[in-house]
Each structure stands twice: as structure tokens, then as C-alpha cells.
Amino acid sequence: MAPHSTRRRFALWTLLLLSGCTRGLLTTVGPDYVQPETAAAKTWQSEQPGVSEAHAAMPSDLRDWWLQFKDPDFFRFLTEAQRVSSSVADARARIETARVEMVTAMANGLPKLDTQVDMLKSRSTFGGPPFDWTRYQAGLQANWEIDLFGGISRQREAAEGNLASRHSAWHDARVSLAVEVANAYIDFRYCQALMQIAEKDVISRRESARLVDLAGVAGLRPPADVALAKASYADAEENLMRQQGLCDRSIKGLVALTGMTEIEVRYRLNQKPERQAQLPTPPPFRLKGLPAETLLQRPDVAAAEEQVAEASARIGVEEAKRYPRLSLTGNITPQLQTVSGMSAFSPYAAGAGAAATYFANTWSFGPTLTMPIFDAGKRLAEVEAARIQFEAAKTRFQSTVRTAVKEVEVALVRLKTAEERLPKTREALKGYEKNFTATDHLYRAGFGNLLELEQARRQTLVARRTVADLEQEQVLAWVALYRAAGGGWQDPEGGAPAIPVREDPHNPVTGQKAEDYKP
């Protein structure tokens, strides 16, 4: 019966110790994490996009949004930028660092086993012939810190929060970079559109200057009209040159973002004439779900929320240092010793030069209890510092949420304004173009005034630029809404390594929330 009773007690102790791998064996000090409430309103205050083909989407549904642009060159710029970006690489490195910390935290709650092998050889004399002594030793040392009060489990929770936060920051870096590349690409196509407007304006003014010059030579137009026509033509050429310089600057920006050569960037931008001066068409979507649900999927908001979870767990880590610590240690060390040339000392030696061999086996096992007695308030101060850090993390989270709400609402306003203004500006452009055509015909027939013609030309030029501006603003507003809603990035080569899902355990002993916790 005794052996069976011993085995039952051993199994019971093993189950109890293993149960402490996720919670403290006796209790888990410190607050249990509770997700902070967001100050977001119940509904979006700004009107959602009114596009009929827009589909309702959560941020997780937007991971292939860039692919729906159906612009291979644009998508190539995105993937190249992701590949060479230092900000994305730094974020990925921080993930790996957090993963190492996670492995360390997981290992702290498990037994540790080390081995040691050594050999020692010596020669001694005691006023007589020398004898040699050799020892061979191999040992196993084991140590297991028992998580009595949950300090180790809190370390694991903190590591999980840190890893999840780093992963969200990596995602945020990728989305931010994708938006930056998209804006640069859109700016270049917009610049090309303005270039086309400027080129048409140059052609129109050059023809007007030529006709006015011929009329002036024939004495049909005064010198003032000839000078004004030439000045107008020169002004159009200067505007075209300025616009060309702006487009070249946009290309430099794409080169810096993608790491591609300028020759390759220019080739991809100009290889298909049908895409030149054509803004990409973003797939429309409508935000689905409550603002709080949407915002919590933004990577920056998720990162801030995970930092709150980490800070909450750090309180328990520091609090556990104020309680006793229990460790189980043990070792097994077999030894083999040989002694030669010791006939005078060993009753087993047959004669001079004979050798004797001894075998010994030693072991030890026992608990070690470490109890803090006096530290001049150091541990209590560290708990208070951890609690302050938690409050700061919670404040940063609320600030991030407010910023996210603002960005979504502003993007919705931008989009709605652009959608409402575009039809009006296009209608105005048609009217100005008709007015310019009529004025030009009158002037060519000799019934108009050059000043009226130039005024009609300027009005048409301004209207064309206004339409181009609003078309760009509409595309940029869609990109801004995608970014503000926390849209994802579909990586064709795979994403970051998967991360463990942080648990939200309940402490039946303390039953405390982080905001209520006092050391």
C-alpha cells in the first residue's frame, strides 16, 4: 500500500504544480486585464459613401483592396516598397525580439535541467612514492521555480501583450507605407493629367499667337493684341515646364519609396499609354459595424490596446516580487575514482604500482523558500511605478481612439464633399468650354476681343484644373478612408508569423480590475 500511496501523492503534487503553469498555484496577484472602453459614438456622425456599388466591409475585408485597383504597375510599386522599406524591416525585427522575450517568459514556468561532466587528475606524495588520483564525474542538476503567486504567469501575459502589440505595429507600418506609395502614385498620375491640360493650353495659345501675328502683319490687329497673344503663349509654355518639373519630382519620390531604378520606374509609368494621366479607380466600400468594432481593428488602436494589456500584467509581475518564492532543486552526481601507486595506503592494492577503483553516487533534493524581509520600500515603489505606467498606457489608448475617430470622420467628409462637388464642376467645365469655343470663333471671324478670348481661355483652364483637383481629391479620400478604417495589406509572399491569442483570464481569488488595483 505504501508504494501506491506514494505514487498517488506524487501524481497529485505534479498536477498541482502543472496547474500553476497558467495561474499561480496559491493565487495570482495583480489585476486581471479588462479591455478598456472606447469613447467612440454608437454610429458614425458623417454620412457614409453614397456610391451605389459600394459594399459593406469590415477592415479585415479590405486586405485585398489594393488588388482591386487592377493596375499591375501600381501594385508592383507597392510590393517593391514593402520589400525594401526600413520601417517595415524595423517593425519585423521588433516582432522577432518580442518573440524571443515570449519564449523566455514561457520557459520561466518550466523545469530547468543542466548537465555537467568533468575529469580531474592529480599526483600526490606523502614522503614516499607518488600516487596518481583520477576522478570522473557526470551530474544532472534540476531547478523548478513554482509559481506560487502568479508572477511567472503575469510575465507570460505581459510577453503575449508585447508580442501582439509589435505585430500590430508591423501591420500599421505596412499599411502606412502602402498609403504613402498610393499617394505618390496618385500624385504622379494627377500631375500627368495637369500636364495634358497644360499641353492642350500651349497648343491653343500657340495657334492663337500665330494667327494674331499674321493678322498684325496684315494690319488687321493692333500691336497690343500681338504682344498679348505672344505673352499668353509664353506664359502657357512656362506653366508646362513647371508642371513637367513637378512630375519629375514625383518620379523621384517613387524611386526613393520602391528602391527601383529611375529608368525602371519611368518605364513602368509610361509603358501603357492608356494609363497615362488616368487616376486609379479605388473600389468603393461602406464601413460595416459599429465605430468601436471598426476602430479596434485598426492596427495602431490594436497596438495601443495590447500595450494596455501588457502594462496591466506588469503590475502583477512587480507585485509578485513582494511575496515568497519557492524553488525545487535537485542533483544526481555519479563519480568514478581511480588511484594508482598506493600500496601503502590501500588494503585492496596488491603491491607497489597497483591501482584501485572506487565508484560513488551522490544525490540531493529539496525545496528552497526565499522570503523578502526588508528592501526600504523598493518593491512597493516598483509596483506603484507599474500602476502609473498602466494608467499612462490607458490614456494613450483613449487618445489613439479619438485620433482614429477623427481620421475616419474627416475621410468621410472629404469623400462626401468630393462626390457632391464633382458633378457641379464637370457641368461648369462644359459651360466654360462652350463659351471659349464660341468666343474663339467670334475672334477668328473678326468680331471678338482678344481680352475676352483670353479671359474665356483662363476660365476654361481653371475649370479643367478644378475637375482634375476634385478627381484626385476623391481618390485620395478613398485611400484616406481605407487607412482610417484600418484596412489591411494582402502580402503575396505571406505575412508575419502567427502570434498567440492573448487570453483574458479571471482571477477567482483577487477578482480585481487593473483600474481598481492598488498595491
Residue ranges of each PLM-predicted region?
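Terminal intrinsically disordered/low-complexity segments used for targeting and assembly
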Residues: 2-5, 9-83, 160, 244-296, ...
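Short flexible linkers and secondary-structure junctions
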Residues: 22-180, 326-330, 335, 360-366, ...
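Sec/SRP-type N-terminal targeting helices
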Residues: 89-90, 106-107, 146-174, 224, ...
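Hydrophobic, well-ordered secondary-structure elements that form the walls
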Residues: 328, 369, 386, 393, ...
